[in-house]
């Protein structure tokens, strides 16, 4: 089947905590669109799903990575970012066969001070903006290499008051989803 828009991603694209309504619903679901984002998704989950997807999209959004960047170690730089980028590259290779246009969204900043006490985590994990920044830099380079549009939402969110737009350490409230929709609309 052909869709104008599709999204693969994690809980932020799914709309966790917002009655499952995200920036994608706000901007695209009135069109021929398919939302394939799910809570807890990692890069490898998106790869498994996108390989099996028989649909074609005019524009496919990829918004995943934060769940891969959470670690059991309470300090930054414990994640093998190069391995994650290699996994993401495999996703992009398959995505190119499924969509005319691809947009890759950066991982958003996190509220480090709230880790590890997050109800949505099964175990204690930590997240660090230093890891997010490194990942985003490498992801932007990967997108440039593959001539895929990279949407830097991280920088825009760093200028906002995260206390007002986040409901926990990583998830956006309705106002946060609206801010992300504004970035997509630019």
Language model regions located:
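Substrate-gating cap/lid alpha-helix
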Residues: 112-153
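Short, well-ordered beta-to-alpha junction loops that form the rim of enzyme active sites
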Residues: 106-109, 153-155
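Conserved SGNH/GDSL esterase-like catalytic core that processes O-acyl groups on lipids
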Residues: 2-7, 12-90, 94
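Alpha/beta-hydrolase-fold catalytic nucleophile elbow
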Residues: 63, 105-106
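Histidine-centered active-site loop/cap adjacent to the catalytic His
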Residues: 30, 35, 46, 140, ...
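Short glycine-enriched, charge-decorated loop/helix-capping segments at active-site entrances
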Residues: 74-81, 121-126, 165-169
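A short acidic, helix-capping loop that chelates divalent metal ions and anchors anionic groups
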Residues: 44, 69-74, 113-115, 161-166
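A short helix->loop->beta-strand "cap" motif at the edges of active sites that frequently abuts
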Residues: 97-102, 148
């Amino acid at each position: 089947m052909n869709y104008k828009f599709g999204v693969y991603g994690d809980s932020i694209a799914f709309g966790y905590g917002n009655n499952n309504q995200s920036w994608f619903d706000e901007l695209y679901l009135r069109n021929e669109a398919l939302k394939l984002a799910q809570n807890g998704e990692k890069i490898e989950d998106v790869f498994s799903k996108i390989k099996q997807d028989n649909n074609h999209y005019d524009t496919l959004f990829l918004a995943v990575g934060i769940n891969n960047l959470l670690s059991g170690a309470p300090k930054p730089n414990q994640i093998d970012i190069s391995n994650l980028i290699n996994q993401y590259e495999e996703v992009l290779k398959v995505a190119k066969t499924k969509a005319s246009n691809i947009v890759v969204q950066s991982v958003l900043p996190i509220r480090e001070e709230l880790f590890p006490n997050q109800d949505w985590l099964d175990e204690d994990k930590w997240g660090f903006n230093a890891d997010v920044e490194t990942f985003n830099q490498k992801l932007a380079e990967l997108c440039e290499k593959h001539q895929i549009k990279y949407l830097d939402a991280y920088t825009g969110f760093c200028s906002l008051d995260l206390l007002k737009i986040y409901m926990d350490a990583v998830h956006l409230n309705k106002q946060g989803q609206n801010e992300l929709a504004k970035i997509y609309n630019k």
